[in-house]
Amino acid sequence: MKAKLVSLLAQANIKISDQQIQQLIDLVNLLNKWNKAYNLTSVRDPQEMLVKHILDSLVVSPYLQGDRFIDVGTGPGLPGLPLAIINPSKQFVLLDSLGKRISFIRNAIRELRLTNATPVLSRVEEYQPEDKFDGVLSRAFASLKDMTDWCYHLPKENGYFYALKGIYQEDEINELNKKYTIQKVIELSVPELIGERHLIVLR
């Protein structure tokens, strides 16, 4: 698995330490183990997890501005856990409303000895953080309008929303509240992943 991950990282031009590579492998092994009992992801093959969960999360990293982020609807910690592993100086809150997902994330944080990731069991509309975030991340929302409607209270005044999407559909933009504007649409390249991936940055 290590050789495969090293190859994927090289193709994506992502440079990280040997320790971080090992943490990512350990994360996949943990997810694979828990998945058999708790059905956390439809991806069953650890090699496939490297592409669809790890690399698909990591390619967002260069575009994150700031130090404090929240991953909303994180599921089993995606993209938040991989991003926390390779960005030890940034803080990540991982929010989900399903207990089994947060239990997995707590276990992963403990096993991987991560000090910059905090799991929160809550519905997003009920979560009221003491401090707002530089960035609100999500792979979970069906539309940009849903993301901004549910998460409007989370970013700082100059904070960003980072939506990870498949195909970029312009009609989603027309549904947005006029107070939000698209800052960037970035076509992401994920090695060995079939299909389009985009990062939409708005505020």
From Swiss-Prot:
Primary location recorded for the protein, binned into one broad class: cytoplasm
Pfam name, any one: GidB
Similarity field: Belongs to the methyltransferase superfamily. RNA methyltransferase RsmG family.
Originating gene: rsmG
Superkingdom of origin organism: Bacteria
Subcellular localization: Cytoplasm
InterPro entries: rRNA_ssu_MeTfrase_G, SAM-dependent_MTases_sf
Alphabetized UniProt keyword annotations: Cytoplasm, Methyltransferase, rRNA processing, S-adenosyl-L-methionine, Transferase
Cellular component GO terms, alphabetical: cytosol
EC code(s) of this entry: 2.1.1.170
Positions contributing to S-adenosyl-L-methionine binding: 73, 78, 124-125, 139
Gene3D superfamilies documented for this protein: Vaccinia Virus protein VP39 (3.40.50.150)
Protein name from the UniProt record: Ribosomal RNA small subunit methyltransferase G
Catalysed transformations (reactions): guanosine(527) in 16S rRNA + S-adenosyl-L-methionine = N(7)-methylguanosine(527) in 16S rRNA + S-adenosyl-L-homocysteine
GO MF annotation list: rRNA (guanine-N7-)-methyltransferase activity
Function: Specifically methylates the N7 position of guanine in position 527 of 16S rRNA.
